Swiss-Prot record:
Organism the protein comes from: Psychrobacter sp. (strain PRwf-1)
Name of the featured protein: Large ribosomal subunit protein uL11
GO molecular-function terms, A-Z: large ribosomal subunit rRNA binding; structural constituent of ribosome
Highest taxon of the lineage: Bacteria
InterPro entries: Ribosomal_uL11, Ribosomal_uL11_bac-typ, Ribosomal_uL11_C, Ribosomal_uL11_C_sf, Ribosomal_uL11_CS, Ribosomal_uL11_N, Ribosomal_uL11_N_sf
GO cellular component terms, A-Z: cytosolic large ribosomal subunit
Organismal lineage: Bacteria, Pseudomonadati, Pseudomonadota, Gammaproteobacteria, Moraxellales
This protein's encoding gene: rplK
UniProt family annotation: Belongs to the universal ribosomal protein uL11 family.
Spans through the membrane: none
Length: 143
């Protein structure tokens, strides 16, 4: 018989830097999960990733206080800021452009996010990421 699910927790945790401080500790503590066990498992699972990369994580908590977690790919906005070499997007994206990305850079981001995108093919996925870039005030070349 399958375990009874007690709840879900969605967090963005930096790769390799999970610790019991907020926001992780309080979120897991409310559900009665062993916080240190999660931190150790998460840090071990993200050891091969770039430290500090924000990883959206969905934690499933079961009635016996055990847990499993699913890690998604980093947010497109973070990857776009990194590719464009900027700290943050534009406050007025249609007026002020803050950086540039090429189609090759967009394709690289699509390869990273491929599992989480619902696009039918590479071109559609590139257009999706290009739209995110435009909404951040990043100029897109070649799309």
């Amino acid at each position: 018989m399958a375990k009874k699910i007690d709840g879900y927790i969605k967090l963005q945790v930096p790769a390799g830097k999970a610790n019991p401080s907020p926001p992780i500790g309080p979120a897991l503590g409310q559900k009665g999960v062993n916080i240190m066990a999660f931190c150790k498992e998460f840090n071990a699972a993200t050891a091969s990733m770039e430290p500090g990369l924000p990883i959206p994580t969905e934690i499933t908590v079961y009635a016996d206080k055990s847990f499993t977690f699913i890690m998604k790919s980093p947010p497109a906005a973070f990857l776009l800021r990194k590719a464009a070499g900027i700290a943050k997007g534009s406050g007025v994206p249609n007026t002020t452009k803050v950086g540039k990305v090429t189609r090759a850079q967009l394709e690289e981001i699509v390869q990273t996010k491929n599992a989480d995108l619902t696009a039918a093919d590479l071109d559609a996925a590139v257009r999706t990421i290009a739209g995110t870039a435009r909404s951040m005030g990043i100029d897109v070349e070649g799309v």
